[in-house]
Amino acid sequence: MTRKLVLLRHGQSQWNLDNRFTGWVDVDLTEQGRREAAAAGRLMREEGLQFDVAHTSVLKRAIHTLQGALAELEQDWLPVNKSWRLNERHYGGLQGLDKAETAAKHGEDQVKVWRRSYDIPPPAMDLEDPGHPIHDRRYAGLDRNALPGTESLATTLDRVLPYWHDAIAPQLKDGKTVLVTAHGNSLRALYKYLNNVSREEILELNIPTGIPLLFELNDDLTVKSFRYLGDPEAARKAAEAVANQGKAK
């Protein structure tokens, strides 16, 4: 039996548009982002996907993308699980900074390492910073030592994997069709795990906003196939645009 999993990065957010590092800052979608969410729903509807359950983060750009896609699918009733473990990678002291200006200051190579390397985190956010998640009431029930002040992709994967094993994988093994709407780096982490991508290869992986990535999985959840829905060239160009965000103007 083939299991189906869709990974969907949220639509364009205001800070995607502004080319700023977002991380755990709770920025909403732009109008373009809302259109992308609806378009993702149409692509999934055209594919004939009937989901049993959905998962998302606790950040509204992902939540609103999921809501927009489910409305287009006419599956608004779907059970939805929200978890901080699906949040975007925490960008530490870079959060809120303009990516191009940061590249001009520190060099494109350094910014690429911070954005796309596997195990090198950006400079950490100070615990006293009001933007640190220990001061956010949505995380009040969590061990403050589990809340990051910065993350690499490796530590993001360490955060995401327990949720995969405890919540998502059992549903897939039960034969459920699952939709995960999350963020560029939490989805890169899942992609790396599912496809056993090397540390070197993951540096070049960019996930576009608002384009569903369909995985077909075997019974043991190894990957049988995966592809973006819709026009492959559109997905390629969108991923290329993501890669260019970290370049100086």
Curated annotation (Swiss-Prot):
Specify the pathway.
Carbohydrate degradation; glycolysis; pyruvate from D-glyceraldehyde 3-phosphate: step 3/5
Site (Transition state stabilizer) location in chain: 183
Whether Isomerase counts among this entry's keywords is: yes
Molecular functions (GO terms): phosphoglycerate mutase activity
Q: Any one Gene Ontology biological process term?
A: glycolytic process
Q: Which Gene3D superfamilies match?
A: Phosphoglycerate mutase-like
Which residues are catalytic? 10, 88
Record's keyword terms, sorted? Gluconeogenesis, Glycolysis, Isomerase
* Enzyme Commission designation: 5.4.2.11
Catalyzed reaction equations: (2R)-2-phosphoglycerate = (2R)-3-phosphoglycerate
Q: Which Pfam families match?
A: His_Phos_1 (PF00300)
Q: Where does substrate bind?
A: 9-16, 22-23, 61, 88-91, 99, 115-116, 184-185
Enumerate the InterPro entries for this protein: His_Pase_superF_clade-1, His_PPase_superfam, PG/BPGM_mutase_AS, Phosphogly_mut1
Q: Describe the function of this protein.
A: Catalyzes the interconversion of 2-phosphoglycerate and 3-phosphoglycerate.
Family per similarity comment:
Belongs to the phosphoglycerate mutase family. BPG-dependent PGAM subfamily.
This protein's assembly is summarised as:
Homodimer.
Protein name per the record: 2,3-bisphosphoglycerate-dependent phosphoglycerate mutase
Native organism is Stenotrophomonas maltophilia (strain R551-3)
* Origin organism lineage: Bacteria, Pseudomonadati, Pseudomonadota, Gammaproteobacteria, Lysobacterales
